């Protein structure tokens, strides 16, 4: 789509090539012909009174994210995209204008070609998408009513063009990926042994042992279970390496687990065209992508067919259909479980080998000459005895002996008919059907690893989801001289069904991983979720002289998620705008070519209620679990008591904004201020113990988000030899609880308190290392005789510091501001697109680093190189407590592990060369483009060792790292 605009309007960001372009430089030309996809239709950009951002296919094509919504990162103002972890195919978290709930869903509604999409968004190929439109305020989203409080993303797929000959395009890419950032630096084998000895010696000193150095030497190997040296006691009583001691191995777990050359290939093909009445678009794609952890991958195949035809002068019909399937292997890449790949790197030091060793340190082979994985308990005849951690586990062995394969398929068909009933009256009916399958199968090896004791384990989940969405709309548009009105009425019925089945068994023979071959069926379970939604919608628009615009929308939604008494919800949106530059007093202004003021106000809803980490479809009803064995009889357990008064979460949204074009529209932009107040928040309320259950869902509180959005675009140079355009966007918002059913309560590292953000850290305050004892210290309140706080003082008692009154607020996990910077250059046949995204002001609690700074409190656990700076003698001034092998609170949760999380990332870079069309004509080719594409090319970050894109809660979880991907591609058009 080669969009050319005369002005920028309504906070809508349109890209030509990679930036906003002006069609004419004349300030007097101000009418805009381009239309924008909005709720249940399209509108001229000039007529939109709400806050909308559009990203087109060329911007999408310049990013390599498997999930098409990842292309919004850094390009869509007001949209915060967070991609956590390096598993390819994972969908990013999307936050539009803050976070409007504490327990319900905070993710936007996805609309695909006019209907809600419930499948996996990464099953949609970016090559099939024409544009994505983000609706951010009540004025633009109110027609989606109960599902729109978190914003709406409308994805529009490509179509053919009328009277266009067949146009075929093929794109192929081959690439390689590696971790985008460096991990925390950990100790090598020699240093680990040295400082382990030091920690044991310090413990012996504390115990009053007569010769602590010799005691540490005698204890070292027994405490670790393994000896990587060629001598029995490699460290002497003074902490030095004995003469002749050499390491037999020094395992680099990072190299063994992480994929430093992850292969990528992608192939896309489409053909489109049309005659005088019918258009078509046919596309197919294949993507094969390896992840940052070895054996992780994502493979996808898809096909799409879009057809439209004007079968009668008064009748137009169309159908959009697609099928996609994907497969992923998902080794555990987060969390602190024994099977987590990243946790393993940060837990197992280099002294523990990947493969078993004999008494001389040589590798032990099996009967086929293969190395044997070391599972931490080698037994007799081997050099080593037993690890003090993760016995019967080996992360590398798990990568290749176990698997967790997820297969998804998605089928959509969306048909419509448009009938012109009269000159200004039309009717549209649309029926969409979506079916998606989820199939996960996990296998833990029968012979080695955690499931060896039960003969292996197989877990399988199979789920089938179906969605039917039926809409009918009546549209009336009429002009009376300078007056223009539009009326729209819509009736929508939505039905969703999700059928889930899970089973697990143990005891498998070699080569068998089918559930019905298990010896012991461990568990079986299943459920069916259903939802129905009936909606009545209306929209009215009016403008006078295409200068003054008014819009009102209303929807009434009825959802089966709520009781009959609270089932109906009414939602609305109001918007107004004024194009000031069309007034006579600005008509000939040489500086201001376009100026528009706009505002909107309305109320939206949120019916995506979360219970126990999953969406709840029966939140108001009494829930039971049946099938529990009670003394051999079928039993029933109360899961949750009913609350028939439970109702919608509601969000009241208001926005004021200005759009402008300056200096013959060489500089264009928009500025928005928004406020979003969410009330009737749904959260778990405790029940009396006599009820026999802990919580039930209730409407208990309110929260608000407010902030600014700034978007600027400039056409720096535009001539035949050189083009350069720039786009910059910045967003900032604050988050605050305004109502709660209790004064406050702790939620992990946060405290929910009225007047504070739900993202404010509330933890003990680190005071440093006691120079005399080498142990940690913290600040607590200093109180007078009357109990009044008069200041802060230092204590070495962590229990006191961890009391609620002594903790402090210490930064927020949401950034002060975030956004992106895009520059597009074109010199002759060469073009370059560079996109940076950035985030400043947020804090992250690095629990991974916290575990690496335990100071050898537990034997055998890996440590950061920073423990080499630990306190050793009275009077030492350092910020690292002493290394001591005894339980202590030195690395307990506190501000010691809270860090600024600022970053700037070169998100995408595309350098292309287009061969001259005159050279291609002889070959029947009309396009030949060679390009190099990079994703996550470079990262600057204030806190090293983690990927800066962590969850919005600001806590690390030993997640895998995003990949830096470099690809070589070619596009050929016929």
Language-model segments: residues:
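Short, small/polar-rich motifs associated with maturation and membrane association
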Residues: 1-304, 308-312, 316-318, 322-324, ...
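Conserved small-residue
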Residues: 169-245, 333, 698, 717-813
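C-terminal extracellular loops and terminal segments
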Residues: 69-73, 697-704, 745-763, 810-821, ...
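Acidic, glycine-rich flexible loop segments
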Residues: 207-251, 264-266, 337-397, 403
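Extracellular/periplasmic, surface-exposed regions of secreted and cell-surface proteins
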Residues: 28, 33-34, 60-63, 106-107, ...
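Extracytoplasmic gating/loop element in the C-terminal half of outer-membrane beta-barrel translocons
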Residues: 240-244, 451, 559, 839-929, ...
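Glycine-rich, aromatic-lined ligand/substrate-binding cores of catalytic
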Residues: 812-845
